[in-house]
């Protein structure tokens, strides 16, 4: 389902734990890390799509999370032609996304990357909040920056940490890589 401009409606999920670290998933059989995300089906609201994608990709149910906020508007990114399926070329430009900020109220052990027969991730880890900006594929970086900045205001409002909002060019850059943050342990699906 594409909109008139050629963008597929989609939801993105920033899931945080009690330390405000973000869930970071490794795409199956690739060395690409990203946040959970997925398309909105016809007749589905963004919230319904978010809960469906959360279960399909991370194995979590609504009772495992609390919604802290969402982006106000659609955030768009264009997908380079070489990533677009042949049958979509000429029509498909990219994704438009509503991003949700969720707090895990369950346990790490509630995460199940094999909740469906078509898993998206084969490993996951908790990462510092801004690390994904340095590790995500380039064409998604601006949307990640917008989503993380907008939702950081909600997440960090009580801690006065919004002064660390990341800027694409001028902000501080982390030297952490997905293999070196937090506890240094990736969770492998099995």
Swiss-Prot record:
Residues forming coiled coils: none
Protein keywords: Hydrolase
Disordered: region residues: 167-190
A GO term for molecular function: pyrophosphatase activity
Entry cofactors: a divalent metal cation
Nudix hydrolase domain segment(s): 6-149
EC number(s) on file: 3.6.1.-
Pfam annotation, one family: NUDIX
Keyword Oxidoreductase: no
InterPro entries assigned to the protein according to its UniProt record, in alphabetical order: Nudix_hydrolase (IPR020476), NUDIX_hydrolase-like_dom_sf (IPR015797), NUDIX_hydrolase_CS (IPR020084), NUDIX_hydrolase_dom (IPR000086), RppH (IPR022927)
Motif Nudix box positions after renumbering to this chain: 38-59
PANTHER family: ADP-RIBOSE PYROPHOSPHATASE, DIHYDRONEOPTERIN TRIPHOSPHATE DIPHOSPHATASE
NCBIfam families reported in the protein's UniProt record: PRK00714.1-2, PRK00714.1-4, PRK00714.1-5
Family in the record: Belongs to the Nudix hydrolase family. RppH subfamily.
Role played: Accelerates the degradation of transcripts by removing pyrophosphate from the 5'-end of triphosphorylated RNA, leading to a more labile monophosphorylated state that can stimulate subsequent ribonuclease cleavage.
Name recorded for this polypeptide: RNA pyrophosphohydrolase
Annotated organism of origin: Bordetella pertussis (strain Tohama I / ATCC BAA-589 / NCTC 13251)
């Amino acid at each position: 389902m594409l909109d008139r401009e050629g963008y597929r409606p989609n939801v993105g999920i920033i899931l945080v734990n009690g330390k405000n670290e973000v869930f970071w998933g490794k795409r199956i059989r690739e060395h690409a890390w990203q946040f959970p995300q997925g398309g909105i089906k016809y007749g589905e609201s963004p919230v319904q799509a978010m809960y469906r994608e959360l279960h399909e990709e991370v194995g979590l149910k609504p009772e495992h999370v609390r919604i802290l906020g969402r982006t106000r508007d659609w955030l768009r990114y264009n997908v380079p032609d070489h990533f677009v399926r042949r049958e979509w070329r000429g029509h498909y430009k990219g994704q438009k996304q509503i991003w949700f900020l969720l707090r895990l109220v369950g346990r790490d052990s509630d995460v199940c990357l094999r909740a469906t027969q078509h898993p998206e991730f084969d490993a996951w880890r908790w990462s510092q909040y801004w690390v994904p900006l340095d590790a995500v594929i380039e064409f998604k970086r601006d949307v990640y920056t917008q989503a993380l900045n907008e939702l950081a205001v909600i997440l960090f409002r009580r801690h006065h940490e919004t002064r660390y909002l990341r800027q694409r060019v001028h902000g501080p850059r982390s030297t952490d890589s997905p293999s070196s943050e937090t506890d240094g342990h990736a969770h492998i699906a099995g």
